[in-house]
């Protein structure tokens, strides 16, 4: 989960990373009030989860509260790379002597953590990597040893930060590592990390990505969820503990196990080539549970997608036997009632398959069509979606 800058700075404050004081708002009038409270020039910054805010006119210097009002009025509603600005961060403008770059991230290729540090802050780090690679330090971090002050100082030194700021920078770098580890982040980035004329080190910007898989031990992170930006179907699936990703096709997919669901997407896409080019509408993995409640929740999410014209339920019975899945489907259709209004192609195989098929046959629901194989089921679902 990507955070807005103001949310990243909330985590920074929690771990004593120094930042410039400010507040978030969604109104120009409030932006003026915040500027008056700060009593110094401020920066008015669009809160969007994308880069290039400055170039798009989303970051402005305001010398007076009236300037803050004017800039806020202009920035709110601005479209920045498809992201509409709904919130602003009004923060005290800082005097800047130098700008640096620091980040911690997962290095998936080398299966380790990585610190990146550069004296060339305030610009796109990709540009630094391309034009001045020698100015960008990439330092592997041992997950067990972590980052103490000495190692943090070494990271700053390798990033070519001036000798006179190494000690102060090391303190902030260690605290950013604390944010990375204790908040279960996959990215913590500060660009720029600045030195002020009086040699303070401040995180003027902040970019944090949290690992949603760690949500069970980070309940407080739920408050960072941007419900306005989250697809409502994905939000509903998440509330029901379903692994769901919306796609742009017409055939709804329900399966048990990520591997089987991925294979089902491929088979449906292939079958769709013979039926008007229809495609899978989603990824939905119900995992090991196929109870009536789980199946009803899954169908409710999929049928809420207006693009879906048919649904393909593809289940291989293992620990969860096919008869339990079949009972779940029958009961789910009873729970949903008239809301279940799209044809349902069901392919069962594996443990207790004959009993599962018998249960579906006896139920004789008008929407349910059984298929013997995955290929046959995919073909039928694609055919129905193309009608």
From Swiss-Prot:
It comes from the Bacteria. Substrate binds at residues 256, 318-320. ATP binds at residues 45, 52-54, 94, 99. Mg(2+) binds at residues 191, 205. InterPro entries: ATP-grasp, ATP-grasp_succ-CoA_synth-type, ATP_grasp_subdomain_1, Succ-CoA_synthase_bsu_CS, SUCC_ACL_C, Succ_CoA_ligase-like_bsu, Succinyl-CoA_synth-like. Pathway: Carbohydrate metabolism; tricarboxylic acid cycle; succinate from succinyl-CoA (ligase route): step 1/1. The keyword Iron does not apply. Binds 1 Mg(2+) ion per subunit. Residues 9-236 form the ATP-grasp domain. Pfam families: ATP-grasp_2 (PF08442), Ligase_CoA (PF00549). One of its GO terms (molecular function) is ATP binding. One of its GO terms (cellular component) is cytosol. Keywords: ATP-binding, Ligase, Magnesium, Metal-binding, Nucleotide-binding, Tricarboxylic acid cycle. PROSITE patterns: ATP_GRASP (PS50975), SUCCINYL_COA_LIG_3 (PS01217). Succinyl-CoA synthetase functions in the citric acid cycle (TCA), coupling the hydrolysis of succinyl-CoA to the synthesis of either ATP or GTP and thus represents the only step of substrate-level phosphorylation in the TCA. The beta subunit provides nucleotide specificity of the enzyme and binds the substrate succinate, while the binding sites for coenzyme A and phosphate are found in the alpha subunit. NCBIfam families: PRK00696.1 (NF001913), sucCoAbeta (TIGR01016). Belongs to the succinate/malate CoA ligase beta subunit family. Heterotetramer of two alpha and two beta subunits. This is Succinate--CoA ligase [ADP-forming] subunit beta. It comes from Mycolicibacterium smegmatis (strain ATCC 700084 / mc(2)155). The gene is sucC.
């Amino acid at each position: 989960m990507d955070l807005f800058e103001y949310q990243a700075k909330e985590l920074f404050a929690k771990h004593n990373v120094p930042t410039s004081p400010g507040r978030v708002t969604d109104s120009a009038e409030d932006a003026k009030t915040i500027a008056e409270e700060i009593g110094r020039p401020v920066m008015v910054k669009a809160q969007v989860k994308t880069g290039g805010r400055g170039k798009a006119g989303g970051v402005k210097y305001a010398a007076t509260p009236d300037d803050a009002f004017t800039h806020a009025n202009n920035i709110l509603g601005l479209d920045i790379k498809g992201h509409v600005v709904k919130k602003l961060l009004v923060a005290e403008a800082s005097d800047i002597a130098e700008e640096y770059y620091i980040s911690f991230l997962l290095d998936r290729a080398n299966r380790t953590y990585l610190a990146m540090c550069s004296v060339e802050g305030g610009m796109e780090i990709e540009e630094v990597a391309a034009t001045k690679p020698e100015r960008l330090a990439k330092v592997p971090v041992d997950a067990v040893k972590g980052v103490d002050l000495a190692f943090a100082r070494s990271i700053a030194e390798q990033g070519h930060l001036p000798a006179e700021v190494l000690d102060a920078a090391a303190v902030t770098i260690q605290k950013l590592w604390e944010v990375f580890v204790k908040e279960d982040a996959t990215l913590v980035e500060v660009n720029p990390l600045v030195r002020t004329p009086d040699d303070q080190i401040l995180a003027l910007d902040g970019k944090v990505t949290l690992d949603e898989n760690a949500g069970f031990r980070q309940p407080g992170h739920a408050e960072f969820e941007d419900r306005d930006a989250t697809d409502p179907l994905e939000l509903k699936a998440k509330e029901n503990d379903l692994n769901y990703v919306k796609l742009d096709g017409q055939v709804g997919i329900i399966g048990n196990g990520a591997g089987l669901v991925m294979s089902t997407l491929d088979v449906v896409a292939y079958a769709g080539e013979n039926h008007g080019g229809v495609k899978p509408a989603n990824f939905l993995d119900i995992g090991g549970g196929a109870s009536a409640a789980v199946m009803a929740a899954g169908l409710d999410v999929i049928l809420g997608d207006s693009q879906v014209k048919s649904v393909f339920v593809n289940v291989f019975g293992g620990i969860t036997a096919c008869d339990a899945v079949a009972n779940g489907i029958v009961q789910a259709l009873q729970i949903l009632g008239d809301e279940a209004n799209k044809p349902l192609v069901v392919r069962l195989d594996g443990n207790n398959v004959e009993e599962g098929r018998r249960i579906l046959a006896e139920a004789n629901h008008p929407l349910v069509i059984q298929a013997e194989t995955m290929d046959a089921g995919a073909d039928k679902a694609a055919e129905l979606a193309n009608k």
